[in-house]
C-alpha cells in the first residue's frame, strides 16, 4: 500500500476501564493549577515525537499555567545525557529499553508505553516504491538507502531490524542492505543540512539517497506531496513502542501530573493526528 504521507496505522485499543481511569487522573492535573512563576518541566523526548508533544505541551500549559520545556533528539544520545547528569523531569524514548534502563538504575520511576508507531519507508515519487515490491526495490543496486544511526537512535535500530528480517526472506539480504545503508541522521557526526531544513527530506530531495527507512509518524499533520510513504509488507512489519518514565530529582508533583496528562484521552487524542497509535483511547484511531 502506497500513500503520500497519509497512511495512519491502526493499533489495538486500550481497555475502556483504563481510558476512564486515565481520564479521571488527567482531571486532577487541571484542578490544581501551577503556581505563578512555576519552574518549567524539562522533557527529554525522541525527535519523532516533537510535533505531537509540542501541541500537547502547549495545550497543557494553556490549561494549567505549567511551563514545559521540550528537548528533542536521538533517544540514545538523550539517554547518555541523562546518565551523565543532565537535568530532565520526564524521558520519552522511541523504544522501551532506554527508559527501562533508567528505571533499573534507580534514576526513574516505572516505565509505561506512551504511544505506538510503525516503521515505514519514504521515497521520492520517481523511485516507484510500493509495499508489494519494497524488498526488491531496497535490494536494487541503483537505489540508495538512508537510515538513522543505530544505538544512538532507536530509528536506526529499527532499520537494522528490518534488514535482519529481510535476511530471513532472501539469503544474503541483510549484508547487502547494511552495506548499502547510509546513516545520515541521529548520530553525533551526522552530515549538516541547511538551517531549517528537514534532514530526511533534504537528503532525498538532493538525491543523496532515494529512500529513507523511518517511522510512519510525522512532525506535521498534513502530508507532503513531494514524497510517498510506504508501509512495510506484513512479513517485514515492525511496531515501535514508545516508553515514558518520570525521572527522580524533582521534589514536587508537577512531573507526575504532566505524565498522567500525557496518558489521558485529551493528550492521547493528539497522537493519531501525527501518525502515532494512541494507547490511552478506547478507539486509538479517533
PLM regions with names:
Residues 37-72, 76-86, 93-96, 100-104, ...:
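Exported/periplasmic ABC-transporter solute-binding proteins
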Amino acid at each position: 500500500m502506497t500513500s503520500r504521507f497519509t497512511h495512519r496505522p491502526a493499533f489495538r485499543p486500550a481497555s475502556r476501564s483504563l481510558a476512564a481511569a486515565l481520564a479521571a487522573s488527567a482531571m486532577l492535573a487541571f484542578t490544581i493549577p501551577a503556581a505563578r512563576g512555576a519552574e518549567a518541566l524539562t522533557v527529554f523526548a525522541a525527535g519523532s515525537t516533537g510535533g505531537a508533544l509540542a501541541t500537547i505541551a502547549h495545550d497543557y500549559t494553556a490549561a494549567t499555567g505549567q511551563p514545559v520545556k521540550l528537548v528533542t533528539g536521538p533517544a540514545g544520545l538523550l539517554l547518555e545525557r541523562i546518565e551523565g547528569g543532565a537535568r530532565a523531569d520526564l524521558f520519552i524514548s522511541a523504544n522501551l529499553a532506554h527508559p527501562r534502563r533508567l528505571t533499573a538504575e534507580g534514576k526513574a520511576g516505572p516505565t509505561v508505553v506512551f504511544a505506538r508507531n510503525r516503521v515505514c519507508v519514504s521515497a521520492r515519487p520517481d523511485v516507484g516504491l510500493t509495499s508489494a515490491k519494497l524488498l526488491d526495490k531496497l535490494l536494487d543496486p541503483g537505489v540508495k538507502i538512508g537510515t538513522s544511526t543505530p544505538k544512538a537512535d532507536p530509528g536506526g535500530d529499527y532499520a537494522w531490524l528490518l534488514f535482519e528480517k529481510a535476511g530471513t526472506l532472501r539469503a544474503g539480504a541483510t549484508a547487502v542492505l547494511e552495506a548499502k545503508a547510509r546513516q545520515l541522521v541521529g548520530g553525533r557526526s551526522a552530515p549538516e543540512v541547511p538551517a531549517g531544513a528537514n534532514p530526511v527530506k533534504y537528503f532525498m530531495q538532493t538525491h543523496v539517497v532515494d529512500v529513507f527507512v523511518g517511522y510512519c509518524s510525522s512532525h506535521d499533520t498534513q502530508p507532503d506531496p513531494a514524497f510517498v510513504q510506504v508501509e512495510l509488507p506484513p512479513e517485514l512489519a515492525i511496531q515501535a513502542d514508545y516508553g515514558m518514565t518520570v525521572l527522580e530529582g524533582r521534589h514536587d508533583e508537577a512531573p507526575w501530573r504532566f505524565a498522567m496528562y500525557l496518558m489521558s484521552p485529551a493528550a492521547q487524542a493528539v497522537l493519531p493526528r501525527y501518525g502515532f497509535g494512541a494507547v490511552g483511547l478506547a478507539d486509538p484511531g479517533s
